[in-house]
Structures are given as structure tokens and as C-alpha cells.
């Protein structure tokens, strides 16, 4: 691979990994299996190692976790929270062990092994024996303050006998038993069951109502003391013992073992994990001696003295009863395997997406086959292969429909002969899925209009395009059964409120293929108005950093389609007013500088301080790096100050920043 090819591949991998990071860490809605994500991440690491001049400071390999939700107060961690590098097999673990031996000049390394819980990382801070702050990991530097919700967790000590400041790290999760009970309750209330325990745990911690959070039955499992230097703790196991003595739940710790014993422990727990009361997706292997840890230090996103040794996905056999082909908003025909329900990794699996006809053909999947199902990373189920020796003599290859299974319309193959799409613009399924997308939270945010009512509206013919939503009257709504005065009022209010929206949301809501939230934001910033956007040329689009050739063509084609242009005009005529949220900049000492803000600044929230810095012409970064020009320091500045001083970064005091911000 030459340098130009490497550059293109790195850009593709970066965009893909950032997309999946957002789904996993922020939206709690992963689309791909852990092992598929790990393959992408490993490929990016290898390319950046081979072509170091192409590595950017904002590469996913330098980042920890995801973005912070705006609804929560931000909390800056006193000590950075890191992620872990992965090893995927015995060979990679032994490579790690050999590296530790060489770097520590030791013939045998002692490790502490702990369960790698499949939940949400938390930090708990105790001062004078009282729990004062609990926060999520966030991006590793700044997390979300979820103290009130954490105090609702039954096994979190609200007070401890230790009076020194103590920073405890651990994982919030839901046990398998509680997860099953939680989903049973949701089904009884006719609510959609949670896909997995991690999503339920993460969503529970991010509830604004602590009473709702309490209903999730979250538990906290401690695994680290971040400020261990303040205590007489010489190894990992002593830290775990100390936490246990203080009343924290500590599970699955195997202390002071060598590499051979690590492997024995790994295979033993991998075999037994399905019988555990909680989900784990691997083991965490840490060099036991803290002096050795300090000598080894950290990489940009992970410690050098520890790795996550991931388990192989759990596999189960079951029978494929049917293949149903569903139609999405872009007309994509997606085959879904209907299975004899099977327990895999503590979850009942009855449906598995087969993605496209090629997957069915390449694996020769047939109705009636016995298939092997995995849940990689204990999240998303997937069929890996057919058990051919159990196939019946009368089985026949699956014939993918040549017509749309919903409307009977013609189909066409696109996207490199992979995706089959219904090309009938009047297809009921396409219309329904499109309206669902249009009203969704990241789009026009019509929170009072649910999927059930959208199906009713589209089936009746009341709504055929998104613009029809803005024509709905109270009389229209009262024609439907179960429609009351209160619900009708809520719906109409939700529709009316959506008219005042941002340009980014509006562009996203249009449903242009290849345009997600990030691309919509890039387009809004570049064009600044819907009228400018409508006039976009292919050159304009390709000039935008972050938008590739395929995305540019898709956007251009959308804007040169009479029907979609009419939709935009109809929406604007209905009173929809997409406004670009422009950041006005003024010349200042911050203009053109990369700036990081740490600590609290009087008169500013973290978000308003960021906006003020941007108005002064700065690019605000989340973490200090060699590319940071200025660190703005408020009260209770965290670890960023020391790092900035070590790197020789210019320090600006809060008073000076306040004067600049206030003009």
C-alpha cells in the first residue's frame, strides 16, 4: 500500500470508527459486533504505525470513550480515565507478556486478573467519608455528573470509614436475573424490551429522574483506586482488598499469577461465564506491582501495563424457521432470519439480521437449516455458519424476492451489487420508515408522535411525505379511534414546535443517503442557509473536509431531484424555519489558537465558556496535547494543568479570559 492509498484508508477507518463510537458510547445503540469493531480499530492502529506521518491528533486511537450528553452537568476527572488495549487470542497475550518482561527486565511477571464487566464505567469520589461526586467516563477527561442516580444504586456505599479523599473506579451493570425481570415488566406494560443489559444500564444512569434510574436495578462493581498513591497500596490485589473492606462489591479477582496461570484462568472463566449472574466479555490483565505500573506508564488512550483479554463469542445452535424480507426508508430490502428462540450469552435470540442477499448466498443459508448463532461482545447476534450435516434432503436455496415484498414494485441492485432496493416511491413501508426517521429526536424531534401513530397516518393516506405532517388538523386526528383531546393537542404542539429548528437538524431530517448527524453538521457550517445548500455544486461538496466522493455525489443527486427539491420547498412553505446557529468570532489573543479549558470559571458553565472561546476565534479541544496552544485555568484545575506545564503550553488565568469574553 502506498502513502496515498494509506491516507484514503485511514480517513475511511477514522470516519467509520467515530460513527460506531458514537453509537456505542453516546447513543447506547451499537450496530456492529465487538470483534468487527476491534478489527477496524486494529487496522487503523497498524496503518498509523506504518505511516506515522499520517496519524492525526484527533485519531480514534488517541481517544477514550464517547461524547458527553448536554443534559448533564460536566465533571472533570481529577485523574484521567483511560480505556484498555485489547488482546484477542493466546498468541497476542503472550506477546504482551514478553513485552512486559523485556521492559521491566524480569524473567517472570506477576499479574492480577479481573473480570471485564460489560457495563458502563463510573468514577466515585469520597471526601471525609462521604460520596460527593459520581460521574461517567465520558471522553476520559470529562464525564457526566450522575451523582443522584448513583446514590440510588443499592450496593453503592453512601459513606465509608476512610476519611481521606478516595477516587474509586468501577462498572455499573444489571445482573442477568434483574435484566430478565426488567424486560418482563416492560413487555407487560407493552413497552419495547431492552436489546441488552449494557444498554439498559447505560440508559438508566442517564435518566434525569433518579426514581426512573432506580427502577433499572443497577449494581456497582469496583475495580480500581485511581489515587492509590495516597494510600499504602503496593499492588493491585491490596487495592481490591481495601475496597472490599470499605464495603464495595469486588468480584472475580485472581491475584499474583504468572502468564501460564493467566491462560488457565482465561479458559476456565470463558467456559463458565454463561453461568455467571452478570455479563462479562473478557478478562482484564494488570501487572500487579504498582511500581512496575508506574515505570511502564500510559499511551494516549490506554495504560501500557494492562490489557483486556477478550473472550471468543459464545455460540449456540438453533433452527432457522423463516426468512422475512423487510423494507427500510431508502427502500433497502433487508432479510431477517426468524429463529427457534435460543439463549446465547444470557439473552433470548429469535431474530437475526442477514444484511443482504450476498450473505445468504455466501453462507448458503436456507429455511429449515440448523445454524450457529453468536453474540459477539455479548451484544448483537449473528449467524456464522450452517450445520450442513443436519440439513434435510429436501432443502432448497432461498430465493430473494425480485419484487418488493410490501408493495410488489420493481427492485434494483445498487451499492456495488450488494443492496437490493425497492424503487417504488409510493411504497408504504418506505414512506412509514421515512416519516419515523423525519420525526426522530436527532431530526425534527416530534417527540409526541410515536411509531404506532405514524403507521396509522401512513396507512390511512393522511401522511405521504414529511410535509404532510404540517397539514394535519385537529379534525384529521379525531377521525382515528383512541385519539383523545389531550393526545391530539400534544401531537399538534409537537408538530408546531418542530418548525423552529436548526439547519443541521433539517438537513439530517431530509434523509439523504450517506448523511448522518456529523455530515449534516459539516454541511450546515459550510453553507449556513438552506438556500445556499440547495445550490451546492459537486465541487462545493468535495471541498468540505470530512465529505468524500461517494457522499458528495449522493448529496448532489438528492439536490438535483425534482421530487426532493419540491419536498424542501413544501416544508419551508409550511413554516419550517431551519436556522444556522452561527458562532460570531472577534479578533483576540485566542484567534486561531487551539485552546483547552480546565476548572470552573466564575459566571460560565463549561458549555458557555466553550462558546465564548469559540466567539473569540479559538478552536476548543477536550484534552491537552502537543498541539494545544493555550490552557485556560479556572478554579480547581485538574490534571490538565500539570500536563500543560510539562508540555510548555501557555497558561491563561480565568480573570484574563473573563475580560476577553466580556469584551
From Swiss-Prot:
Protein name stated in the entry: DNA ligase
Location of the active site: 116 (n6-amp-lysine intermediate)
NCBIfam families reported in the protein's UniProt record: dnlj, PRK07956.1
InterPro entries xref list: BRCT_dom, BRCT_dom_sf, DisA/LigA_HHH, DNA_ligase, DNA_ligase_AS, DNA_ligase_CS, DNAligase_adenylation, DNAligase_N
Matches recorded under PANTHER family: CHROMOSOME TRANSMISSION FIDELITY FACTOR 18, DNA LIGASE
Keyword Manganese appears in the UniProt entry: yes
Organism whose genome encodes this protein: Brachyspira hyodysenteriae (strain ATCC 49526 / WA1)
Cofactor: Mg(2+); Mn(2+)
Binding site for Zn(2+): 404, 407, 422, 427
Similarity remark: Belongs to the NAD-dependent DNA ligase family. LigA subfamily.
Residue stretches making up the BRCT domain: 585-663
Molecular function in Gene Ontology: DNA binding; DNA ligase (NAD+) activity; metal ion binding
Domain of life: Bacteria
GO BP annotations, alphabetical order: DNA repair; DNA replication
Enzyme Commission numbers on file: 6.5.1.2
Gene3D superfamilies tied to this protein: 5' to 3' exonuclease, C-terminal subdomain (1.10.150.20), 6.20.10.30, BRCT domain (3.40.50.10190), DNA ligase/mRNA capping enzyme (3.30.470.30), Helix hairpin bin (1.10.287.610), Nucleic acid-binding proteins (2.40.50.140)
SUPFAM superfamilies: BRCT domain, DNA ligase/mRNA capping enzyme, catalytic domain, Nucleic acid-binding proteins, RuvA domain 2-like
Catalytic activity, reaction form: NAD(+) + (deoxyribonucleotide)n-3'-hydroxyl + 5'-phospho-(deoxyribonucleotide)m = (deoxyribonucleotide)n+m + AMP + beta-nicotinamide D-nucleotide
Enzyme's top EC category: ligase
Annotated disulfide bonds: none
Residues reported to bind NAD(+): 34-38, 83-84, 114, 137, 171, 286, 310
Function (record text): DNA ligase that catalyzes the formation of phosphodiester linkages between 5'-phosphoryl and 3'-hydroxyl groups in double-stranded DNA using NAD as a coenzyme and as the energy source for the reaction. It is essential for DNA replication and repair of damaged DNA.
Amino acid at each position: 500500500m502506498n502513502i496515498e492509498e494509506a491516507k484514503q484508508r485511514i480517513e475511511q477507518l477514522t470516519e467509520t470508527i467515530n460513527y460506531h463510537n458514537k453509537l456505542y458510547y453516546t447513543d447506547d445503540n451499537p450496530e456492529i459486533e465487538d470483534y468487527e469493531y476491534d478489527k477496524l480499530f486494529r487496522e487503523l492502529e497498524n496503518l498509523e504505525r506504518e505511516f506515522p506521518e499520517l496519524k492525526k491528533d484527533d485519531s480514534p486511537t488517541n481517544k477514550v470513550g464517547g461524547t458527553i450528553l448536554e443534559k448533564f452537568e460536566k465533571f472533570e476527572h481529577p485523574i484521567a480515565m483511560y480505556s484498555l488495549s485489547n488482546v484477542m487470542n493466546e498468541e497476542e497475550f503472550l506477546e504482551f507478556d514478553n513485552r512486559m518482561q523485556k521492559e521491566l527486565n524480569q524473567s517472570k511477571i506477576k499479574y492480577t486478573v479481573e473480570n471485564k464487566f460489560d457495563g458502563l464505567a463510573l468514577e466515585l469520589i469520597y471526601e471525609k467519608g462521604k460520596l460527593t461526586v459520581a460521574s461517567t467516563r465520558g471522553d476520559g477527561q470529562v464525564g457526566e455528573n450522575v451523582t443522584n442516580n448513583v446514590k440510588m444504586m443499592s450496593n453503592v456505599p453512601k459513606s465509608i470509614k476512610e476519611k481521606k479523599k478516595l477516587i474509586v473506579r468501577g462498572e455499573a451493570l444489571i445482573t442477568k436475573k434483574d435484566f430478565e425481570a426488567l424486560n418482563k415488566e416492560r413487555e407487560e406494560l407493552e413497552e419495547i424490551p431492552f436489546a441488552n443489559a449494557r444498554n439498559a444500564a447505560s440508559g438508566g444512569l442517564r435518566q434525569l429522574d433518579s426514581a426512573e434510574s432506580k427502577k433499572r436495578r443497577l449494581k456497582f462493581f469496583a475495580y480500581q483506586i485511581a489515587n492509590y498513591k495516597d494510600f499504602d497500596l503496593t499492588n493491585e490485589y491490596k487495592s481490591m482488598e481495601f475496597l472490599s473492606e470499605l464495603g464495595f462489591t469486588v468480584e472475580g479477582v485472581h491475584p499474583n499469577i504468572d502468564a501460564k496461570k493467566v491462560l488457565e484462568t482465561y479458559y476456565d472463566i470463558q467456559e463458565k461465564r454463561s453461568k455467571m449472574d452478570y455479563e462479562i466479555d473478557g478478562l482484564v490483565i494488570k501487572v500487579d506491582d504498582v511500581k512496575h505500573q508506574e515505570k511502564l506508564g500510559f499511551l494516549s488512550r490506554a495504560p501500557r501495563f494492562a490489557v483486556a483479554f477478550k473472550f471468543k463469542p459464545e455460540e449456540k445452535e438453533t433452527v432457522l424457521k423463516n426468512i422475512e424480507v423487510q423494507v427500510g426508508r431508502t427502500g433497502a430490502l433487508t432479510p431477517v432470519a426468524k429463529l427457534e428462540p435460543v439463549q446465547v450469552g444470557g439473552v433470548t435470540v429469535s431474530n437475526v439480521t442477514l444484511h443482504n442477499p450476498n450473505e445468504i448466498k455466501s453462507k448458503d443459508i436456507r429455511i429449515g437449516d440448523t445454524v450457529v448463532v453468536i453474540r459477539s461482545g455479548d451484544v448483537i447476534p449473528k449467524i456464522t455458519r450452517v450445520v450442513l450435516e443436519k440439513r434435510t434432503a429436501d432443502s432448497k436455496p432461498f430465493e430473494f424476492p425480485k419484487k418488493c415484498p410490501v408493495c410488489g414494485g420493481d427492485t434494483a441492485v445498487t451499492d456495488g451489487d450488494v443492496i437490493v432496493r425497492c424503487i417504488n416511491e409510493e411504497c408504504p413501508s418506505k414512506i412509514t420508515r421515512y416519516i419515523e426517521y423525519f420525526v426522530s429526536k436527532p431530526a425534527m424531534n416530534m417527540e409526541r408522535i410515536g411509531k404506532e401513530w405514524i403507521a396509522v397516518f401512513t396507512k390511512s393516506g393522511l401522511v405521504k411525505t414529511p410535509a404532510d405532517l404540517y397539514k394535519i388538523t385537529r379534525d384529521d386526528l379525531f377521525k382515528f379511534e383512541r385519539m383523545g383531546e389531550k393526545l391530539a393537542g400534544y401531537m399538534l404542539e409537537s408538530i408546531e414546535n418542530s418548525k423552529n429548528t436548526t439547519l443541521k437538524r433539517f438537513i439530517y431530517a431530509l434523509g439523504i443517503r450517506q448523511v448522518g448527524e456529523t455530515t449534516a453538521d459539516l454541511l450546515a457550517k459550510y453553507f449556513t442557509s438552506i438556500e445556499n445548500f440547495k445550490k451546492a455544486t459537486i465541487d462545493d461538496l468535495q471541498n468540505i473536509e470530512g465529505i468524500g466522493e461517494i457522499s458528495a455525489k449522493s448529496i448532489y443527486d438528492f439536490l438535483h431531484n425534482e421530487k426532493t427539491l419540491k419536498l424542501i420547498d413544501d416544508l419551508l412553505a409550511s413554516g419550517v424555519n431551519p436556522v444556522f446557529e452561527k458562532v460570531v468570532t472577534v479578533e483576540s489573543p485566542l484567534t486561531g489558537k487551539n485552546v483547552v479549558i480546565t476548572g470552573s470559571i466564575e459566571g460560565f458553565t463549561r458549555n458557555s465558556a466553550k462558546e465564548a472561546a469559540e466567539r473569540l476565534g479559538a478552536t476548543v479541544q477536550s484534552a491537552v496535547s502537543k498541539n494545544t496552544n493555550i490552557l485556560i485555568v479556572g478554579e480547581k484545575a485538574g490534571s490538565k494543568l500539570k500536563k500543560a506545564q510539562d508540555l510548555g503550553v501557555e497558561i491563561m488565568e480565568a480573570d484574563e479570559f473573563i475580560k476577553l469574553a466580556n469584551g
